[in-house]
Amino acid sequence: MEREVQRVRQAFLSGRSRPLRFRLQQLEALRRMVQEREKDILAAIAADLCKSELNAYSQEVITVLGEIDFMLENLPEWVTAKPVKKNLLTMMDEAYIQPQPLGVVLIIGAWNYPFVLIIQPLIGAIAAGNAVIIKPSELSENTAKIVAKLLPQYLDQDLYVVINGGVEETTELLKQRFDHIFYTGNTAVGKIVMEAAAKHLTPVTLELGGKSPCYIDKDCDLDIVCRRITWGKYMNCGQTCIAPDYILCEASLQSQIVWKIKETVKEFYGENIKESPDYERIINLRHFKRILSLLEGQKIALGGETDEATRYIAPTVLTDVDPKTKVMQEEIFGPVLPIVPVKNVDEATDFINEREKPLALYVFSHNHKLIKRMIDETSSGGVTGNDVIMHFTLNSFPFGGVGSSGMGAYHGKHSFDTFSHQRPCLLKSLKREGANKLRYPPNSQSKVDWGKFFLLRRFNKEKLGLLVLTFLGIVAAVLVNAGYY
């Protein structure tokens, strides 16, 4: 493993990943891979998650293609050095910030969206000029295999490497020194990744999870609310990091919510949900049994049917859920939706704030002041008002968690920034040494006073131009008054 990481590092040190033209070529090659081998990619995703190819395309491939196009369109601007404002002491110098690649990046993917969750950060790492080692999740083995097969056929084989394996291989990888580690997964493993990274002082981006709350105000259209929640909760069989984990609402709304979700489930998946091509399965037997254990002692108002042989769990709703029970102590990551009754928005806000910061917050209400109040009074990785999950689709947003739901962010420009070092550069002249005497010993109060004058006043090009014009105006006025014109 050490030899492989060193091989990738030597490829990075060769400098060929840095030129803009090379980065654009690699991104175009990646897009070509997705387009030309679409059927193979979709088949692998479908095999891992019992997902229809239409769902695999809409949930993963579209996002990847959109991200590549966004990078190709904007990358020439992002890589350009940006001038900064200057003070009087540096007004004659060149001062700018130059984005610089970090080096060798490790991307550790997750199994629930096994393609997009490794390729989307890879896009950002390539755009920033890095070399990358990719470790797909071993639980989504078909996608891991197809990625390992296809990437070397389209991308630089020395700079972008896929390493497959399980816990042992990941543990060995984490012993190596990287310049950034990007991990998507659960909080427990996130802590292990961060601990390993700390030994090398390696910065990390941790895309974790948590229990994303969904508050439903009594002032809303429950038909629309329940359609949107049903879509977001049961998509991918509930195995989505930003799926609504539980509902907070007044007790009087519970029966209406259950009924409307029931009707929507029938509309989305038909009378026989098990036969629907749009309803996936739990990834493996261990997660299947874990989710079943969360149902023990609960009041099942909808669903609850299971089939261990196919790892099927029906869309399920629990009512009158006690916050102290097991289902409210861990991220569900499955098609089980608890409803916790609260008296009002104040109690809902307190409930959220008493727990770990979630990856997402969802609030439904016709009252936008109430939505913005909950935004102001809570903390979460992201927020969508009157819908779920949709903030993920906007690549001008940073996507990431806060607190135990993660650290750092990516998507669009935020991916480029995550994998770049913003390097400040000041270019001075070896002339005008007289002005530098102010900073040389011996010191004096006069030098300190002049230093304050020079350092505490900042200049940009516009202000410098105005200063020059003002100075020329004063000179012209003096000359006129002196009778030269």
Swiss-Prot record:
Annotated InterPro entries: Ald_DH/histidinol_DH (IPR016161), Ald_DH_C (IPR016163), Ald_DH_CS_CYS (IPR016160), Ald_DH_CS_GLU (IPR029510), Ald_DH_N (IPR016162), Aldehyde_DH_dom (IPR015590), Aldehyde_DH_NAD(P) (IPR012394)
Membrane topology type: Single-pass membrane protein
Compartments, record wording: Microsome membrane; Endoplasmic reticulum membrane
Residues the record lists as binding NAD(+): 185-190
Gene Ontology biological process terms, A to Z: fatty acid metabolic process; hexadecanal metabolic process
An MF annotation (GO) of this entry: 3-chloroallyl aldehyde dehydrogenase activity
Residues annotated as transmembrane: 464-484
The keyword Transmembrane helix is annotated on this UniProt entry: yes
Modified residues (Phosphoserine): 293
Gene3D superfamilies: Aldehyde Dehydrogenase, Chain A, domain 1, Aldehyde Dehydrogenase, Chain A, domain 2
EC annotation from Swiss-Prot or TrEMBL: 1.2.1.3, 1.2.1.94
UniProt catalytic activity: an aldehyde + NAD(+) + H2O = a carboxylate + NADH + 2 H(+); a fatty aldehyde + NAD(+) + H2O = a fatty acid + NADH + 2 H(+); (2E)-hexadecenal + NAD(+) + H2O = (E)-hexadec-2-enoate + NADH + 2 H(+); hexadecanoate + NADH + 2 H(+) = hexadecanal + NAD(+) + H2O
Main subcellular localisation: membrane
Domain of life: Eukaryota
Motif (Prevents secretion from ER): 481-484
SUPFAM superfamilies (alphabetical): ALDH-like
Enzyme superclass (EC): oxidoreductase
Active site per UniProt: 207, 241
Topology Cytoplasmic: residue spans: 1-463
Keywords for the protein's UniProt record, in alphabetical order: Endoplasmic reticulum, Fatty acid metabolism, Lipid metabolism, Membrane, Microsome, NAD, Oxidoreductase, Phosphoprotein, Transmembrane, Transmembrane helix
One annotated Gene Ontology cellular component of this protein: endoplasmic reticulum membrane
Subunit relationships: Homodimer.
Function description: Catalyzes the oxidation of medium and long-chain aliphatic aldehydes to fatty acids. Active on a variety of saturated and unsaturated aliphatic aldehydes between 6 and 24 carbons in length. Responsible for conversion of the sphingosine 1-phosphate (S1P) degradation product hexadecenal to hexadecenoic acid.
The family this protein is said to belong to: Belongs to the aldehyde dehydrogenase family.
Protein name, per record: Aldehyde dehydrogenase family 3 member A2
Organism: Macaca fascicularis (Crab-eating macaque)
